[in-house]
Regions:
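Beta-loop-alpha module in the N-terminal Rossmann-like domain of NAD(P)-dependent dehydrogenases
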Residues: 36, 47-109
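A broad helix-preferring feature
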Residues: 7-15, 59-67, 115
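A contiguous active-site-proximal alpha/beta segment in oxidoreductase catalytic domains
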Residues: 97-140
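Structural signature of beta-strand start/N-cap positions in the alpha/beta core
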Residues: 2-4, 26, 63-65, 88-89, ...
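N-terminal Rossmann-like dinucleotide-binding module
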Residues: 1-46
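Alpha-helical elements of Rossmann-like donor-binding domains used by nucleotide-donor carbohydrate transfer enzymes
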Residues: 14, 42, 58, 66, ...
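Short loop/turn motifs at secondary-structure junctions
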Residues: 24-27, 48, 63, 140
Length: 140
């Protein structure tokens, strides 16, 4: 998987070290804003990526097959939609969209395009999942 990362904020800085050892995953490129070009370039060098850009279209035009979107929430829907329309798999930070209509539209579009669409959320530490985990041994 060739991953393109959108965003240069704290969450991206926390995710990149975790992604590095994942077999079969290559962090190919990163896209920031004009204001964060220097930071994108620094992250590119630090994590041996091929590409650092401030133009989202250039990232989508590259060799990536999957996009990880970690930008301000109000941008999630439009950026995810553009990636799906370009045939890219999408992992988008929570909340995936601002409302149910947008979520339904994105899901339908991803299905039509034959790509995966994920919201980046870990549930295993939530109390309801912890409760289920504790109860599993008692029910066999």
């Amino acid at each position: 998987m060739k991953l393109g990362i959108v965003g240069t904020g704290t969450i991206v800085e926390e995710v990149l070290p975790v992604l590095q050892p994942v077999k079969g995953l290559s962090c190919y490129g990163i896209c920031g804003t004009k204001r964060s070009e220097a930071k994108a370039e620094k992250l590119k060098e630090q994590y041996q990526m091929q590409l650092a850009v401030s133009d989202y279209e250039k990232l989508l035009d590259s060799e990536i097959d999957t996009v990880y979107i970690a930008v301000p929430n109000l941008l999630h829907f439009e950026m995810a939609k553009e990636a799906v329309l370009r045939g890219k798999h999408v992992i988008v930070e929570k909340p995936m969209t601002a409302n149910e209509r947008q979520a339904e539209e994105l899901c339908a579009l991803a299905k039509k395009q034959g790509v995966f669409l994920f919201e980046a959320i870990t549930t295993r530490y939530q109390s309801n999942y912890q409760f289920i985990k504790e109860q599993l041994p008692t029910i066999g």
